[in-house]
Swiss-Prot record:
Transmembrane segments: none annotated. Binds 1 Mg(2+) ion per subunit. Residues 251-451 are annotated as: N-acetyltransferase. Keywords: Acyltransferase, Cell shape, Cell wall biogenesis/degradation, Cytoplasm, Magnesium, Metal-binding, Multifunctional enzyme, Nucleotidyltransferase, Peptidoglycan synthesis, Repeat, Transferase. Mg(2+) binds at D102, N227. It is found in: Cytoplasm. Pathway: Nucleotide-sugar biosynthesis; UDP-N-acetyl-alpha-D-glucosamine biosynthesis; N-acetyl-alpha-D-glucosamine 1-phosphate from alpha-D-glucosamine 6-phosphate (route II): step 2/2; Nucleotide-sugar biosynthesis; UDP-N-acetyl-alpha-D-glucosamine biosynthesis; UDP-N-acetyl-alpha-D-glucosamine from N-acetyl-alpha-D-glucosamine 1-phosphate: step 1/1; Bacterial outer membrane biogenesis; LPS lipid A biosynthesis. Its EC number is 2.7.7.23, 2.3.1.157. The keyword Metal-binding applies. This is Bifunctional protein GlmU. Residues 1-229 are annotated as: Pyrophosphorylase. It comes from the Bacteria. It comes from Staphylococcus epidermidis (strain ATCC 35984 / DSM 28319 / BCRC 17069 / CCUG 31568 / BM 3577 / RP62A). The gene is glmU. Pfam families: Hexapep, NTP_transferase.
Length: 451
C-alpha cells in the first residue's frame, strides 16, 4: 500500500514574536520542521508534501528536494491547508499521514505504529491521541459510553464538561487518501474561529458511517506543539533529555545531563566521558574512551579514541587518537590532527594538517599549514598566511624544532630535522638538517640612560 504524508508548515507563528517563521526555530540545533520530516521519512512514507505559506522560500531552502510543496496563500485552517496538497495527492490510493511542522518531538516509531494501526483496522481515519493533566489549548477526544470515538472538539468550541476531558488530539492523523480529499470538499467554517478544521473531516466520515480509530501514545511529550518561546524551551529540554538518556543507556558518561547539549545526529562511543556545559552538534562522531572537558563545543567533527578535549572549540575538524586539545584551543574548519598530537592552551588552528606526534603547546596560530611528524612548534610562533588579498601555505617537515616567537612568512617550506632560533622571522625556504637564524643582533649601549 502506498503511503503519503502532508506536513503543515504554512503558519507564521505570531506568538513566537520573531522575524523567523515558526517551523524554522531550532530544537537541538535543527529546525523543527526538519525534525518532523526526518521522522516522517523514517516511518516509511513514500511521498511527502509540505504545505508552505509564510516563509515559503526559507522552508524550501531548509528541506530542499526531500519534499514536494504546495502553497497556502491564506491561512484558513488545517483542513484548508491539507486541501492545498490536492495537486499532488488527490488521485492517489493508500494512506496519508498528516503531521504538524511544529511537533519536533514526534518519533518515527510512533508514526509507524499509527500507520500500522490505521491500516490493520482498515479505518478511514485514525487520530493520534495522548492524555495529559493539563489539556488546555488542545482539541478533546470525545468518546461515547462504549469508548468509541464520536468526534474531536477544539478548545474554543468545547463546553465545560468537554474541556474537563484529559485525552487530547495531537493534530496528527492517518487517513484513507481518497476519503480524505473527498471529505475535504464538504468541510465548512461555521465555528468560533471561522476556520476549516481538519477534525471536521473525521466528523464527516463518522456521519457517513465510515470507520474512525484512535491510537494513543503514552508519551505526551511527543505531541507537544510549539507555539511560543516557552514551549520552544520545553521542547528543547524534553528532546535533550531523550538524547542524553539514549547515550547514557549506551555506555556514555554524562556527568550533568541538564547542562549538556547533544544534537540528534551525533554519534558517541562507549566509555566516553562528557563534563558539564558541553555542546556537541552537527554530524559529529566521537569514538570510544574520549574525554570532553567542561564548556567544550564541538560541531561537525570526528574525535578519535582516547582523545582529550579540554575547554575548547572544534568545528569541521578531525582529532586523532590519544591527541590532546586545549585548554582554550580553537580548531577551525579544515583542521586535521594526527595521533598523539598536542594542541595546547590558546592555540588556534585553521585548515592545517598536524601530523602524528607534533606539538603546538602554547599561544600559536597555525593556518593553511602542514606540520610534519614529531615537530615542535615553540610558544608564540605563527604562520603568517595572509597578505591582505591571498592566503599562502606553510610546510614544516618532520622532526623540526621551531623556536619560540617565530614568524613563518608564507609561502615557505621548512625541511626535515631543522632548527629555527627563537625570535626568527623566516621568509625563505630552509633545507633539511639546517639551523636558521633570522633576527637582528643584540646591541647593548652601556650607560645610555645616565646621559
Amino acid at each position: 500500500m502506498q503511503r503519503h504524508a502532508i506536513i503543515l508548515a504554512a503558519g507564521k507563528g505570531t506568538r513566537m514574536k520573531s522575524k523567523k517563521y515558526k517551523v524554522l526555530h531550532e530544537v537541538a540545533g535543527k529546525p523543527m520542521v526538519e525534525h518532523v520530516l526526518n521522522n516522517v521519512k523514517q516511518a516509511g512514507v513514500d511521498q511527502i508534501v509540505t504545505i508552505i505559506g509564510h516563509g515559503a522560500e526559507s522552508v524550501k531552502d531548509t528541506l530542499g528536494n526531500q519534499s514536494l510543496y504546495s502553497f497556502q496563500d491564506k491561512q484558513l485552517g488545517t483542513a484548508h491547508a491539507v486541501k492545498m496538497a490536492h495537486e499532488h495527492l488527490a488521485d492517489k490510493e493508500g494512506t496519508t499521514l498528516v503531521v504538524c511542522g511544529d511537533t519536533p518531538l514526534i518519533t518515527y516509531q510512533t508514526l509507524q505504529s499509527l500507520i500500522e494501526h490505521h491500516e490493520s483496522t482498515q479505518s478511514h481515519v485514525t487520530v493520534l491521541s495522548a492524555s495529559t493533566i493539563n489539556p488546555y489549548g488542545y482539541g478533546r477526544i470525545i468518546r461515547n459510553h462504549n469508548g468509541i470515538l464520536e468526534r474531536i472538539v477544539e478548545e474554543k468550541d468545547a463546553n465545560d464538561s468537554e474541556r474537563a476531558i484529559k485525552e487530547i488530539s495531537s493534530g496528527i492523523f492517518a487517513f484513507n487518501n481518497r476519503v480524505l480529499f473527498e471529505k475535504l470538499e464538504q468541510v465548512k467554517n461555521d465555528n468560533a474561529q471561522g476556520e476549516y478544521y481538519l477534525p471536521d473531516v473525521l466528523s464527516l466520515i463518522l456521519k457517513d458511517g465510515g470507520k474512525a480509530e484512535v491510537y494513543c501514545t503514552e508519551d505526551f511529550d511527543e505531541i507537544i506543539g510549539v507555539n511560543d518561546r516557552l514551549m520552544l524551551s520545553e521542547a528543547e529540554k524534553a528532546l535533550q533529555q531523550r538524547i542524553n538518556r539514549y547515550h547514557m543507556e549506551n555506555g556514555v558518561t554524562i556527568i550533568d545531563p541538564s547542562s549538556t547539549f547533544i544534537g540528534t545526529d551525533v554519534k558517541i562511543g562507549i566509555d566516553t566521558t562528557i563534563e558539564p556545559g558541553v555542546r556537541i552538534g552537527g554530524h559529529t562522531t566521537i569514538e570510544e574512551d574520549v574525554w570532553i572537558g567542561q564548556y567544550s563545543e564541538i560541531n561537525n567533527s570526528t574525535i578519535h579514541s582516547n582523545a582529550n578535549i579540554k575547554q575548547s572549540v572544534i568545528n569541521d575538524s578531525i582529532v586523532g587518537e590519544n591527541t590532546t586539545v586545549g585548554p582554550f584551543a580553537q580548531l577551525r574548519p579544515g583542521s586535521n590532527l594526527g595521533s598523539e598530537v598536542k594542541v595546547g592552551n590558546f592555540v588556534e588552528v585553521k585548515k592545517a594538517d598536524i601530523k602524528d606526534g607534533a606539538k603546538v603547546s602554547h599561544l600559536s596560530y597555525i593556518g593553511d599549514a602542514e606540520i610534519g611528524e614529531r615537530t615542535n612548534i615553540g610558544c608564540g610562533s605563527i604562520t603568517v598566511n595572509y597578505d591582505g588579498a591571498n592566503k599562502f601555505k606553510t610546510i614544516v617537515g618532520k622532526d623540526a624544532f621551531i623556536g619560540c616567537n617565530t614568524n613563518l612568512i608564507a609561502p615557505v617550506t621548512v625541511g626535515n630535522h631543522t632548527l629555527i632560533a627563537a625570535g626568527s622571522t623566516i621568509t625563505d625556504n630552509i633545507p633539511e638538517d639546517s639551523l636558521a637564524l633570522a633576527r637582528a643582533r643584540q646591541v647593548n649601549k652601556e650607560g645610555y640612560l645616565k646621559k
